[in-house]
Amino acid sequence: MDYVKNIDLCRCLSLLLVVCTQKVEEFTTPVVGDYKLQCWGAEGKTQSSVKYKYGFPGKGGYSEGILKSIKPATIYISVGQQSSNKTSIAFNNSPNGLTSFAIGCSGGGATNITTTNRGELKNFASYRNEVLIVAGGGGGCEWNGQGGAGGDFVGKDGNSTTARGRKGTGGSKDYGGITGVLPGDTSVNGMFGVGGYGYANNDTCECNDYGAQGGGGWYGGGGASYTGAAGGGSSYIGGVTDGKTIAGDSTNPKQPTPDGKSEQIGQSGNGACVITQLSFN
């Protein structure tokens, strides 16, 4: 596992920071006690290789809660990815049947913790009771505009400022976001674990364009075809207590940073996960 581990000698409590490895990681609680789980979703992507040259992707949401471990147990962590380039698929936000977005840009991957290992979050659609916590990823933005932030319990809508651009809505606690498309374009809405996307064919834009993908999340954000801005994915609190979520565009309150040293308005880049042991029983 790729992580940074620090020991607080004053309290004899441990902290584990898990970064994006593009695979499922595991953590076994060493002793019975309370563990604070913190998750940050990943930021979306834009069309330009120059950051923020044309538009702004949505930033990742945040979730936290307390896991009360009554016996040593193993939990599984999937940290969302901001895709490595504008057309690649982000880990923990991969639509079935797609290997890239050709022309377009992906949404940020969700970050989640589960009690079993079934791979990416989308594979838990029939096993939702195994999901402890989710932080939604931000929506992509193909051209001028703003991708929707990863949500609290509802992802934020995208906002395109181009004449032909469409916008995707954020995912919610019960439904995926709606993908905005031009007439005649293909539309795939957000769904459990995965952001939606649109597809513009030669008749509408003289290109084969996947536009912007919604952020991953409990329910993924809606995408947007051809020059659009996609919605963010929703966050989720499941098998933990004292849970709360903070959207990726929230200014009050702000999110804590993964290193615990400051605050931020949304998560930039890849997601993250922090596990802190709070008590011994």
Indicate residue ranges for each PLM-predicted region:
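Short, surface-exposed beta-strand/strand-loop-strand elements in extracellular ectodomains
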Residues: 46-58
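Catalytic nucleophile loop of clan PA
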Residues: 90-123, 146-153, 191-237
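Extended extracellular/luminal ectodomain segments enriched in beta-structured repeat modules
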Residues: 29-36, 70-74
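Short, structured beta-strand segments at or near domain termini in extracellular proteins/domains
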Residues: 111, 134, 267-281
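A short beta-strand element within beta-rich, extracytoplasmic domains
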Residues: 34-43, 77
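A short aromatic-anchored loop/beta-hairpin motif
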Residues: 15-20
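Secretome/extracellular-domain signature
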Residues: 57-166
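Acidic, glycine-rich loop-and-strand cores that form catalytic or ligand-binding grooves
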Residues: 130-132, 155-217, 221
